[in-house]
């Protein structure tokens, strides 16, 4: 059964965040295996799309204080409205509850088709960052809950994310649909080649201890914890290289902090990397993936690192830690600078422990998107077959 589906999200290329990558991989694999799937998202400046599926873009403006994110303006984009009206969707899937999500909901009502949404993000944290009023924050959280209540199917990427949704007050049913990875586990010779090229990219020696962070450069990601720990490592005379990949509003202040701590020789900022082939080389060159975020729900980057046998360090009891067993397929720390520093110092002296955890991560954490999409397609077709037209 071939189906036509739309993936709606407020972030998409050239923004390289986890939710945008999820929407991309849904569209990519559904389009390749099960019919037609397309992305509906805001325009990104003069960015040109080069993907194997259709992309429908609508006008947008930069979101103040949240660079590189944008606010979509589909209602005033006449050309976009004409184009999207001609698409015969069988089902629409929203990956956020805001502009593009509301657009998907409206389309589902007009066409009388199933509406699916995934709860990806801790929206209350986002609201609190820009709004210093608990009443308004509660109002916005309730607004998002109404959105999820309107869906025929609500998905979450893991158990912890579902619990967050319940904490917000959602009482309806939801299903776990895990995220996957578009990275391919490289063969041994390929991995060696990637590593050699990656070390050259970051100007690191073959025996240098390399740590990596990939993600939006936002303080919510707990990046300050990383930089503070790096300072402690430097004061203790440790040799290392820390690589940051990504962009975001905090990037400038992160660089200032690195200079303040005199870490310029130890830290590399590569910026956003849209070329996934180049990013593979950076993963391959790394010993550890350091991701202490307590904001993220089910970060794709941990799976990406696992594909290259690189274990992650995450905060104990965070959503990111749900699939990690300490020392088995990753490492757990308390949300403290001292504990991260202690763990890093111990692992610098124990490459065997890193290797064991890296192999465990590759076997238990990494899952290719292609297999995930088979399950997505099954649920989509069930919804389409048993959808009851509204009266």
Task: Identify the residue ranges that each predicted region occupies.
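Aromatic "clamp/platform" in nucleotide-sugar-dependent glycosyltransferases that forms part
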Residues: 294
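Conserved acidic donor-binding segment of nucleotide-sugar-dependent glycosyltransferases
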Residues: 326-327, 331-337, 346-351
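N-terminal subdomain of nucleotide-sugar transferases
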Residues: 1-47, 51-57, 370
């Amino acid at each position: 059964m071939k189906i036509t589906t739309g993936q709606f999200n407020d972030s998409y290329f050239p923004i390289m965040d986890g939710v945008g990558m999820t929407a991309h991989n849904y569209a990519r694999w559904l389009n390749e295996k099960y019919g037609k799937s397309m992305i509906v998202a805001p325009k990104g400046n003069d960015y040109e799309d080069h993907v194997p599926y259709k992309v429908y873009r609508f006008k947008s403006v930069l979101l103040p204080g949240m660079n590189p994110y944008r606010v979509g303006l589909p209602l005033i984009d006449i050309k976009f409205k004409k184009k999207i009206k001609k698409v015969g969707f069988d089902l629409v899937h929203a990956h956020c509850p805001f502009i593009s999500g509301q657009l998907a909901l409206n389309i589902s009502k007009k066409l009388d088709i199933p509406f699916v949404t995934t709860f990806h993000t801790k929206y209350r944290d986002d609201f609190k960052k820009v709004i210093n009023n608990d009443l308004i924050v509660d109002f916005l959280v309730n607004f998002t809950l109404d959105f999820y209540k309107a869906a025929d199917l609500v998905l979450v990427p893991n158990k912890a994310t579902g619990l967050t949704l319940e904490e917000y007050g959602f009482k309806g049913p939801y299903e776990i649909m895990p995220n996957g990875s578009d990275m391919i586990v490289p063969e041994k010779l390929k991995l060696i080649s990637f590593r050699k090229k990656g070390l050259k990219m970051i100007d690191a020696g073959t025996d240098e201890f390399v740590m990596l962070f990939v993600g939006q450069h936002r303080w919510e990601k707990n990046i300050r914890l990383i930089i503070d720990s790096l300072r402690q490592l430097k004061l203790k005379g440790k040799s290392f290289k820390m690589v940051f990949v990504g962009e975001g509003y905090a990037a400038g202040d992160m660089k200032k902090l690195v200079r303040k701590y005199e870490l310029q020789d130890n830290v590399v900022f590569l910026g956003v990397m849209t070329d996934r082939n180049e990013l593979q080389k950076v993963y391959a060159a790394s010993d550890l993936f350091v991701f202490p975020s307590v904001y993220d729900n089910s970060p794709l980057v941990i799976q990406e690192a696992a594909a290259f046998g690189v274990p992650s360090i995450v905060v104990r009891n965070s959503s990111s830690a749900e699939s990690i067993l300490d020392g088995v397929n990753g490492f757990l720390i308390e949300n403290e600078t001292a504990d991260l520093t202690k763990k890093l110092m111990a692992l610098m002296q124990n490459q065997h422990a890193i290797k064991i955890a890296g192999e465990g991560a590759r076997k238990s954490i990494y899952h290719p998107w292609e297999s995930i999409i088979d399950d997505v397609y099954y649920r989509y077709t069930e919804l389409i077959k048993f959808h009851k037209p509204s009266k």
